[in-house]
């Protein structure tokens, strides 16, 4: 099996540059398992259409300015973030963006190197680390639409509020976030047309926050999961501090699994990991392990330590520490 190609932004506090260029035109049509091959249309709607392709751009961890550190840790990096481009013969749809101006310029350069016409940018959910950089991308692609479901837009407005920026985002990333944030327009309906193929926005409800979605491309078996699934990165369960919320997240994972995807791209993933559908089951197991250990431990430290024993190699221990404290304090 041919290993799939992943494009990684290089740099740590310096200008970010795509590691491989050009990112898209050189790539053969690939299956959702990562093999390079033509994708066969699955419905009459797509017969005769150019098969869609997709690529993932991952920006590495960047340092966060905070004193809120996990036990034994000297720093708290923000985990890698992924952005996915889905494209046909001419046009492309970009799913999610990044936090900082530098990250987002690298993303825009990567998309521009493809020569594709970026028609649409879609946000899977309202967390700022997946849309603050859209304004920077739009400087390069001013004709692209930035869209999301109305309930996602409501969360975006909260994240981009002066209070949220002043108390959370800007102190953690001083001078790095655009001062001209844009909010998505509310999308009417749940389907984006890409050269005759459906890109379906699937409402998932609560996952790591309220009103989340994933994007499903039936013709190529792809799900872009946003933060509904993680890949080698500790899940952010801070907002899931009640059992009912964690069960809602599991139900969302079940819903994605019912679509029978052949590839699933997580919003936060360890660089180099495959975009395998097994990350749905892995994310579900993580939540269930957290749930089980939450009932058998008494302190945040104990819960944190027990989860680390199960997931020693996963990134972003700071998120695990915050999750443990959210239900033990």
Predicted segments with their positions:
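Extracytoplasmic/secreted proteins, especially bacterial periplasmic and envelope-associated proteins
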Residues: 106, 132, 136, 248-251, ...
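Zn-dependent metallo-beta-lactamase
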Residues: 4-90
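Short catalytic-loop micro-motif centered on adjacent basic/acidic residues
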Residues: 93-96, 119-123, 200-201
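Accessory terminal helices/loops
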Residues: 258-263, 270-329
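Conserved beta-strand hairpin/beta-sheet module of binuclear metal-dependent hydrolase folds
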Residues: 56-113, 117, 214-226
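Metallo-beta-lactamase
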Residues: 41, 92, 99, 153-205, 209-210, 219, ...
